[in-house]
């Protein structure tokens, strides 16, 4: 079996803690694993009101790739909204990325605005239940909407089949976050030369209660990945509810692309 260096990227409002089950599962198989907190996430000391864009939010990933030794490549695994982090990183450091893995994730394309899949997600799932919304003005004068994910949303739509302990952990450590949708809408498209050229693997389940099946099928049809894996059962957090299945898939990704 081939071993690889996996870099695990959480979604907005979360942190590296979301990978606490998958990281050791991959390490037991001999892989190197780095789980990063994005800006104003997890234990990163910044507040979301200090972050001006999704690119700035991605800074820890970009800094990590910048420092990666020349010739070394990683497989980036992004959950949920972290597909955007993968795209941003691939446009800057395409030579350092062996593949991008989209885990029940946004799958942006290179044809439309970077906000396109966000807009489609919000059309598919417009009511974020008991989520609270706030606004602030960023450095360029844009009004940024932030959110604190509601506990009902977390339990019924994200951590649907997770244990009570995993749900309680999420409630305790969840932070405010943002999709930076209006800033993404003005951002240049992702490039064919960068993001468009990396290998893309899509992992999903039709039991996801926020990235609904029709939305995920639409994404796959819109920007066809190199490989698609459909996991049976689970929920939005496959890394928690189907840990071994995801680890097995990632081994196949390593065998193919590392």
UniProtKB/Swiss-Prot annotation:
Exact pH optimum pH is difficult to determine due to the fact that acetone cyanohydrin is very unstable above pH 6.5 but HNL activity was found to rise from pH 3.5 to pH 5.4. The pH of the cell sap of damages cassava leaves was found to be 5.3. GO terms for molecular function: aliphatic (S)-hydroxynitrile lyase activity; aromatic (S)-hydroxynitrile lyase activity. 2-hydroxy-2-methylpropanenitrile binds at residues 11, 80. The active site is at 80 (proton donor/acceptor), 236 (proton donor/acceptor). Its EC number is 4.1.2.47. Belongs to the AB hydrolase superfamily. Hydroxynitrile lyase family. This is (S)-hydroxynitrile lyase. It comes from Manihot esculenta (Cassava).
């Amino acid at each position: 079996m081939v071993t690889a260096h996996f870099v695990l990227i959480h979604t907005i409002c979360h942190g590296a803690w979301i990978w606490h089950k998958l990281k050791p599962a991959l390490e037991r198989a001999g892989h190197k694993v780095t789980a990063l907190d994005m800006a104003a996430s997890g234990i990163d000391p910044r507040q979301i009101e200090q972050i001006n864009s999704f690119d700035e939010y991605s800074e820890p990933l970009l800094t990590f790739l910048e420092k990666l030794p020349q010739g070394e490549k990683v497989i980036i695994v992004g959950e949920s909204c972290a597909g955007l982090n993968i795209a941003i990183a691939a446009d800057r450091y395409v030579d350092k990325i062996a593949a991008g893995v989209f885990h029940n994730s946004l799958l942006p394309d290179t044809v439309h605005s970077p906000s396109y899949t966000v807009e489609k997600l919000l059309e598919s799932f417009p009511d974020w239940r008991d989520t609270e919304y706030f606004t602030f003005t960023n450095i360029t004068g844009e009004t940024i909407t932030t959110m604190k994910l509601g506990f009902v949303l977390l339990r019924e739509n994200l951590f649907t089949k997770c244990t009570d302990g995993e749900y309680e952990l999420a409630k305790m450590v969840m932070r405010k976050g943002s999709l930076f949708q209006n800033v993404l809408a003005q951002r240049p498209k992702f490039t064919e030369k960068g993001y468009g050229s990396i290998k893309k693997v899509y992992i999903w389940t039709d039991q996801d209660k926020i990235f609904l099946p029709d939305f995920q099928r639409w994404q796959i049809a819109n920007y066809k990945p190199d490989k698609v894996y459909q996991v049976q059962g689970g929920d939005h957090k496959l890394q928690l509810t189907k840990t071994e299945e995801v680890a097995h898939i990632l081994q196949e990704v390593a065998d193919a692309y590392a």
